[in-house]
A protein has these predicted regions:
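Upstream accessory/linker segments immediately N-terminal to the RecA-like ATPase cores of bacterial MutS
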Residues: 74-265, 638
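Long, highly charged, low-complexity intrinsically disordered interaction regions
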Residues: 1-14, 23-26, 231-232, 242
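C-terminal accessory region of SF2 helicases/translocases
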Residues: 589, 601-693
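Short boundary/loop segments of OB/S1/cold-shock single-stranded nucleic-acid-binding domains
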Residues: 42-62
Length: 693
């Protein structure tokens, strides 16, 4: 057996993986064979047996076999190929919305067909839309899968079949190389070796319930989850210990700048804002770096808190960097801060991908020589060409969009002669207390738990897709009769950006036909940042009535005149994302409304989630409910909630493991530092460098 370790086996060692495929795999965090094996299936399909048609159930997947009784093309808005199969127990209809003449001609009456797909309730009988199918010769033996079929999350240009072939080869490699078994028995409560767990989870025998696997409840999954949580906890503990030993500039107000700034505002800070600012000022007065997380619900006024933190550093002659996750949000911050700070002679600069040529060179020079005191940008702020004059405070907005590694890179950039900048992280994704201790174990936490006066409550209604016509009329009424603006959000989850962009464009066209008098704009993830910003600027300037968007508008867009939001397929989104999207309205003095449209029938979990949205606008309550609902079984990936980047763990689902993980992490840090390093390296890869920051 080879002594080579899995993370040393390149992807190109697998047949069929060249540079182009390796680049696509890299997009989803897969850089070597170990990464590929840690990319576990998000769900499984049981294709190991044929289900009699009489026994199929809506909203479940099934393999069926039957004979064609009828195949016809129905003509409407677009042609649909409908094929009726019978197996003697009952009938089922296969529907194809995209088909060609060859497909149609293969479904001759009497032909034997095997099909697999999700069963839906139809008008006359059960239906499967776009099934995978095979037309069989009458004497051809039926072949079925021997294990559950894994379904992996993927990216544009990577098909499920290709990923399965690659993992098949990776499993063969797994059998031939040594796998470092990092968890000694006393730290492995689940009694599976790493190799056993990986072999089982990529190709589970049909005796294991797909439902148990999808809930993350199988001991083989728990074995991997436990090790990953342990690695993250060890990394956070190392980080916190390291940070406390570093030096920072202690900051105290030198002038009356704060009082003059507050006097210039048309409103007074809320009690919660004042309390959080006091926490920050206390941290900034210390000679070790502040590492504070400020959680504020949507619209709670985090920007003002950030401005007051920045003022203290600037009053000491220092620079402040504020990093936002998108160019739209960075530009919005740049405008807000310029309006607030320039009257006091404070120069505000901004740096994003679209700042190019001479303007970029001039901005970089102004940052380097200290002419600009407040620098705002996207991740462009930590490119090597950016050199700060005297950076004392780093503010990161919407922490969940940045990995820990990124914010530490920015902190390293500010380090001079072993003096490190203070860090303030702001998030509008409220984190249940149970989880905050794990995700942000290296940070102190403050909460802004009060909304500024003048914010109007948002009325939320839940309506079926069947009432789409009424919803379109409501949009017309809001935009034309009430002179308001509206958002129409389209969602496609686990689909490619290309499909999402096409769907959004099609919806925008449909709405433009239905509402010819309205000025309609479109933004989606496939557009260049400049295009997105141009459309957003038009919307903000009220030159557009309706903005059709994908979930790219989730964070920080501020248009007070927008008072109506429609979210299509709302049942597909998690609570955190729904809450963020809804927070784009309710920012002015007019009563705002949010319409959550869903495709019936609505599952039990989706129904609970939409009810929580209808009943509450409190982000912390919604986060706790999210925890409860997910604990009942429907698991959405961690990435969607923006909690942290995990390969196999989901903090919501796996929170019961956390106390034991924390206990073991404390023991390992003290008793076995080399084991801590090995675990961190395996699960965090090059991101592990941040533990030495």
């Amino acid at each position: 057996m080879s002594e080579q370790l899995l993370d040393g086996v390149p992807l190109t060692a697998l047949s069929g993986v060249g540079a182009a495929i390796a680049e696509k795999l890299g997009r989803i965090g897969i850089h070597n064979v170990q990464d590929l094996l840690f990319h576990l299936p998000m769900r499984y399909e049981d294709r190991t047996r044929v289900t009699p048609i009489a026994d199929v159930r809506p909203e479940s997947f099934a393999t069926i076999e039957g004979f064609v009784q009828l195949a016809e093309v129905q003509f409407g808005r677009r042609p649909i190929l409908s094929v009726t199969l019978s197996d003697g127990t009952s009938k089922i209809m296969l529907k194809f919305f995209n088909f060609n003449a060859g497909m149609k001609n293969s479904f001759v009456v009497g032909a034997r067909v095997k099909a697999f797909g999700e069963v839906k309730r139809g008008r006359f009988m059960a239906e499967i839309h776009h099934p995978e199918y095979q037309v069989l010769r009458n004497n051809q033996p039926l072949t079925l899968a021997e294990t559950l079929t894994p379904i992996y999350s993927t990216t544009e240009g990577l098909k499920q079949a290709s990923l399965r072939k690659m993992t098949e080869q990776a499993l063969a490699v797994l059998n031939n190389v040594k796998v470092a078994e990092l968890l000694p028995d006393q730290y492995n409560p689940h009694q599976y070796s790493l190799k056993e767990a990986l072999l089982l989870l990529h190709r589970p025998p049909p005796s294991i319930s797909a439902e148990v696997l999808e809930k993350g409840e199988h001991p083989a999954q728990k074995r991997l989850i436990f090790e990953e949580l342990l690695a993250h906890n060890l990394a956070m503990q190392q980080l916190r210990v390291g940070a406390k030993q570093q030096q920072a500039q202690a900051l105290h107000y030198q002038t009356d700048l704060k009082a003059r700034f507050l006097a210039s505002l048309p409103f007074a800070p809320t009690g919660a804002q004042q309390r959080v600012v006091a926490d920050i000022e206390r941290d900034l007065a210390q000679a070790s770096p502040m590492m504070r997380l400020v959680q504020g619900d949507v619209g709670s006024g985090k920007t003002l808190v950030a401005a007051l933190a920045a003022l203290l550093a600037i009053d000491n002659g220092k620079q402040v960097a504020l990093m936002a996750p998108t160019e739209i949000l960075a530009e919005q911050h740049a405008n807000n801060f310029a309006n607030w700070l320039r009257p006091f002679g404070i120069e505000v600069g901004w740096l994003a991908g679209k700042v190019k040529g001479k303007a970029r060179t001039a901005q970089l020079e102004a940052i380097k020589n200290g002419e600009v005191q407040m620098i705002i940008g996207t991740h462009a702020l930590f490119q090597e060409s950016v050199v700060f004059h005297d950076l004392a405070l780093v503010i990161i907005d919407e922490q969940h969009r940045f990995g820990v590694h990124q914010r530490l890179t920015l902190r390293e950039k500010g380090a001079k002669a072993d003096i490190y900048p203070h860090q303030l992280i702001m998030t509008a994704t409220p984190i249940p207390r149970t989880l905050a201790m794990t995700v942000y174990a290296d940070l102190d936490t403050s909460i802004i738990d009060e909304l500024p006066p003048g914010r109007t409550p948002i009325t939320t209604v839940v309506v079926s897709e069947d009432r789409r016509g009424e919803v379109v009329q409501r949009v017309y009424q809001a935009c034309k009769n009430e002179q308001r603006q509206a958002y129409w959000v389209c969602t496609l989850i686990d689909e490619s950006e290309v499909l999402e962009a096409q769907a959004a464009a099609a919806i925008a066209e449909d709405l433009q036909r239905a509402l010819p008098d309205l000025r309609i704009g479109l933004v989606h993830g496939r557009m260049k940042p400049q295009e997105k910003q141009a459309i957003m600027a038009e919307f903000k300037a009220a030159n557009l009535d309706l903005l059709v968007a994908t979930t790219v508008i989730e964070v920080g867009v501020d248009v007070p005149n927008a008072s109506l939001m429609i979210i299509e397929n709302s049942e597909r989104l998690g609570l955190a994302q729904l809450h963020q999207l809804r927070g784009r309205v309710g920012r002015g003095a007019t009563a705002s409304h949010c319409v959550l449209m869903y495709k019936p029938p609505l599952g039990k979990i989706s129904s609970k989630r939409l009810q929580v949205m209808r009943d509450s606008q409190d982000g912390f309550y919604i986060a706790e409910k999210d925890l409860e609902i997910r604990g009942t079984g429907e698991i959405l990936g961690t990435k969607q909630t923006g909690m942290a980047e995990f390969k196999v763990a989901d903090l919501m689902r796996d929170r019961k493991m956390i106390p034991l993980v924390q206990r073991y992490a404390k023991q390992i840090i003290v008793e076995n530092p080399p084991l801590a390093e090995a675990l961190i390296k395996r699960w965090l890869g090059d991101r592990a460098e941040y533990t030495n920051a």
